[in-house]
Amino acid sequence: MLFSGVYNYSTDALLWDDFLAGNQVAYACMYERYAKVLYNYGYKIAQNRQLTEDCLQDLFLSILETRNRLGRTDSIKFYLMRSLRRELVRRLQAESRFDADPDAIEFRVEFHYEPTWLDAQVSADQSAALLRELDVLPPRQKEALFLKYFDNLTYEEIAGVMGIEQSSAYKVIYKAIAALQKRVDTGVLLLLLMVAKDH
């Protein structure tokens, strides 16, 4: 990590406030903290490395250039994910990669079986079955589960990132979990979601 010790911001609010005040170290720290997460999320939407990198670079340049007009936020990750998603959707629409409906995004996240401590808790067959079921969920449900359990966003933040109402975020995640519960052992599902929360 490039910025530790004195530049190790304890909260996003403090980091954002320093960035808004023009602190270049805060800007660099913010980039270091969130660029990889943003790239991974953006790539799942765009499936294009160059486009994802371009949008990510443009996003960080844009917030630097417009920081005097930006408001406060308690969650930089949420703010940046929402902004990146909007820009990717705009550019993909311009390229006619999907129609004008942002819900048409094919959110591509594949869940792969990798031996972990989860194997000590459940059989390899159960783990593999659950991961196969995750792979066949509709893209919107996969994205919502990914944001909730792998990126640890709140329902309000998920709604903001995906451009939906908070009640819709609850429903999408509920439907995804309900679909999984019908096809896999509930205990295995709970273990996976607990593992995801820790990452």
Task: Kindly label every feature range from the protein language model.
Residues 40, 54-61, 74-86:
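Structural recognition of an alpha-helix C-terminal capping motif at a helix-to-coil junction
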Residues 85, 89, 141, 156, ...:
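DNA-recognition helix of helix-turn-helix
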Residues 21, 113-143, 153:
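Amphipathic alpha-helical segment used for protein-protein interaction
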Residues 2-7, 160, 178-199:
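C-terminal edge and immediately downstream basic/flexible tail or linker adjoining helix-turn-helix-like DNA-binding
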Residues 65-72, 82-102, 123:
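Arg/Lys-rich amphipathic alpha helix in sigma70-family domain 2
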Residues 8-9, 90, 98-123:
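Internal acidic/polar
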Residues 1-37, 63, 199:
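N-terminal module of bacterial RNA polymerase sigma factors
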